[in-house]
Swiss-Prot record:
Its EC number is 2.1.2.1. One of its GO terms (biological process) is tetrahydrofolate metabolic process. One of its GO terms (cellular component) is cytoplasm. Pathway: One-carbon metabolism; tetrahydrofolate interconversion; Amino-acid biosynthesis; glycine biosynthesis; glycine from L-serine: step 1/1. (6S)-5,6,7,8-tetrahydrofolate binds at residues 119, 123-125. The modification N6-(pyridoxal phosphate)lysine is found at residue 228. InterPro entries: PyrdxlP-dep_Trfase, PyrdxlP-dep_Trfase_major, PyrdxlP-dep_Trfase_small, Ser_HO-MeTrfase, Ser_HO-MeTrfase-like, Ser_HO-MeTrfase_PLP_BS, SHMT-like_dom. Its cofactor is pyridoxal 5'-phosphate. It comes from Thermodesulfovibrio yellowstonii (strain ATCC 51303 / DSM 11347 / YP87). This is Serine hydroxymethyltransferase. The keyword Amino-acid biosynthesis applies.
Amino acid sequence: MKMKSLREVDAEIYSLILQEKKRETNKILMIASENYASRAVMEAQGSLFTNKYAEGYPGRRYYGGCEYADEVERLAQERAKQLFNVEHVNVQPHSGTQANMAVYFAMLQPGDTIMGMSLTHGGHLSHGSPVNFTGKLYKTVFYGVNKETGYIDMDEVRRLAQEHKPKIIITGASAYPRTIDFKAFSEIAKEVGAYLMADIAHIAGLIATSMHPSPVPYSDFITTTTHKTLRGPRGGVVMCKAQYAKAIDKTVFPGIQGGPLVHVIAAKAVAFKEALSEDFKEYQKKVIKNAKTLAEALKKKGFKLVSDGTDNHLMLVDLTNFNITGKEAEEALDKAGITVNKNTIPFDTKPPTVTSGIRIGTPSVTTRGMGEEEMEKIAEIIERVIKNISNDSVIKDMQKKVQELCKKFPIY
């Protein structure tokens, strides 16, 4: 059988890939959960390891011919352990949510109480949202941010924990721009006899390079995705203390998954190697510097930021003073060539399909090589679009400015 190229086999998919490449090349991507994977990561993910079934774990497979799959998984495990300084790693979860699921299924029973950050305050679906499996299987309690400061209300966290005695407390968020105090969460968890799980999906790259305090000394379990600030393939990882290793491993397989995606694990291993480099540390420094520069520039232009700024890779913009919705802002900015996402803000009165805010992140633009000067220009473009949201002429002018920046900073 002659192996044909994608272009020969499926012109439609080939064309869509080219169109997506054009979109990513010619627009400024500022969705905080997105990034550009390296060529090396994509080569590994597109490798012939996609052909291999490897149920089980290295040295304990249910299929023959796994000698190289074993080596790939061992490399990924050892690199992740080195990167995060943890005792045990499982690199098989297909996603961040499945990594979270592994912890829940290993340590909880249906009907147990979990406590996480409210989705509308910046949390994640898999931390107890009623539309997620967590909200259906477990009793859920939500903490949020202080209405005045925009910071996590640790007094509320302690009060709710003491009142409801959750079995597990989840820290981590999808739209929280400030440093998370893992030590304070740990103290509260110990007070009420709860496990502490840190979901670091958004800030894993920052933690790996010491740009954000690590949850490792304080947490029983740590979960993450491998994309976002880690800049790897889409996937998940569970890390834990050695005493929980067996429970986690048997929950991932055979508990909630079958065969691992060896090609994705290979790509994870590559991403971990990249993340161990000095270049990656410099990259993370620039991600934060760019975020702070952009946040300050937007504030000077009259934008209100939740918590009045950022400590990490993202900011949450409150658009209520401009009398437009997050949905309207997302659509207008995309026309100009800047891709963000509508996002609820704490105490939002609008539904999540509309929202009063937008979330903006700097990982992707920093990967392209943009710096503080470009953040000032991007702030200006955002201002012009938001203040002239119905003016097609202004939006076309801003589109030209976006194109100039994109040409100056190619991706691949």
